[in-house]
């Protein structure tokens, strides 16, 4: 039906003038490290949980990044730990008061000063995604060498939102040969976590754990009228995978995300249509909140799915 490019390639000049229908991959959240590096506060984030650690006598130290690729993530030590992190006694199921623990930045660990002996504890924390997980996947699988790690930025946040709309218009004006813009995809990636050896540690194509930030969560709280807890996402470490019965709070969060994402999708597809081009969506990758089987998708303005 059409000729296209793909991740890791550039469209050859020889094919631009042959009169064929052309569609081009377009990345809304990456392939612009200059912007990402200039605006680190609007880097994408995710929730992650540590393994279970058992207390004995005295304080318990829980390292946050054990089992997680440091190429992929780094601890968000910028936002308020007490507000957005959660330390839970998994033996009782109760969260600890923020006064009962502290963060040691030098070791990237949480220290519980007086845990209950032989109880198990976890830490749920926010981490910045410093390498787009799909780009990491493509790089690892294809054994790409000397490739700059693409940093994903959060289109939901104010500065990046405004920049993204301007960037899309500039792209359309500089690519007149493109007939179809194939968004790959929109704003939030499914849950994809790698370990220190670049192995896939946890994958859930329907996971919402990488669609979070304090900015987004504050908006969610205003809409639903109750306080957000990391446990709504973490779900005892199951991350609300499709074998779990979702809580009311998690379903509220999903519905909120779909409404917000579909509205932002419409903003971008309207721009594409204004330039006389079609808007196509890749089914996968950054598709959280874009699920075509949910009712909110109908208002997104997408012309096709591939």
Indicate residue ranges for each PLM-predicted region.
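Glycan-processing catalytic domains of CAZymes
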Residues: 1-306
